[in-house]
């Protein structure tokens, strides 16, 4: 089990995309960067690149500016430069198959139809890429493309900061400990959202069979 030294947050660049569900990976990546010690921010590998330290370890954050479907271009450039290895990165992205308020970490697997992750898998030539999926749920009365490219609704906004904080902490746990998936088990983090109150949500970590 390799520890993680690069967090890659997926999304689309531009102000019009900043508040959309599809950009939740960007939000988590920025939250991770805010938790690093002595961060340095620059432009590299077709995106924003942040170097820093966490728990005594060097860790970097990459926010690709290539648009979602070409996220692999940014990751492949970092791999070619020797700045990361596929098995030691954690890709953070939105997931339609998980309800809002739930995140799930896995060590490897297919893309599940997510074009950003598929671009990365194609670019590095392997599916053994750790990933952290952040649930956005499926639309009830809208096309999927319109839904992911739309802003968060009012109810989601109430719990969004809790979700982002929890996902950032989960990513940094992977920096400390690696992505802990044993045999055929899935690491799932359920969030008890603190809606209508000011209390923090509690994290419940459960290992579930696939």
State where each predicted segment sits:
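Intrinsically disordered, low-complexity regions enriched in serine, threonine, proline
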Residues: 181, 192-197
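Residues in and immediately flanking transmembrane alpha helices
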Residues: 107, 196-201
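Surface-exposed flexible segments
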Residues: 78, 206-207
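Short glycine-enriched, charge-decorated loop/helix-capping segments at active-site entrances
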Residues: 104-110, 148-153
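Nucleotide and nucleotide-moiety/phosphate-recognizing core
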Residues: 2-108, 117-133, 139-143, 158-165, ...
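Alpha-helix boundary/capping motif
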Residues: 186-191, 199, 203, 210
């Amino acid at each position: 089990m390799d520890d993680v030294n690069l967090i890659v947050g997926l999304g689309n660049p531009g102000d019009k995309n900043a508040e959309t569900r599809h950009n939740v990976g960007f939000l988590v990546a920025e939250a991770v960067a805010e938790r690093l010690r002595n961060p340095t921010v620059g432009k590299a590998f077709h995106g924003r690149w942040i170097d820093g330290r966490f728990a005594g370890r060097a860790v970097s954050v990459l926010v690709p500016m290539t648009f979602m479907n070409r996220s692999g271009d940014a990751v492949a450039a970092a791999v070619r430069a020797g700045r990361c290895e596929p098995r030691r990165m954690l890709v953070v992205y939105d997931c339609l198959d998980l309800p809002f308020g739930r995140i799930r970490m896995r060590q490897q697997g297919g893309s599940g139809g997510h074009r950003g992750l598929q671009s990365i898998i194609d670019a590095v030539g392997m599916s053994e890429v750790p990933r952290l999926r952040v649930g956005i749920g499926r639309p009830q009365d809208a096309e999927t493309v319109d839904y992911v490219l739309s802003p968060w609704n009012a109810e989601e906004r109430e719990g969004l900061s809790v979700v982002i904080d929890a996902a950032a902490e989960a990513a940094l746990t992977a920096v400390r400990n690696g992505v802990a998936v044993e045999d055929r088990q899935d690491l799932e983090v359920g969030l008890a959202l603190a809606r209508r109150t000011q209390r923090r949500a509690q994290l419940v970590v459960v290992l579930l069979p696939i």
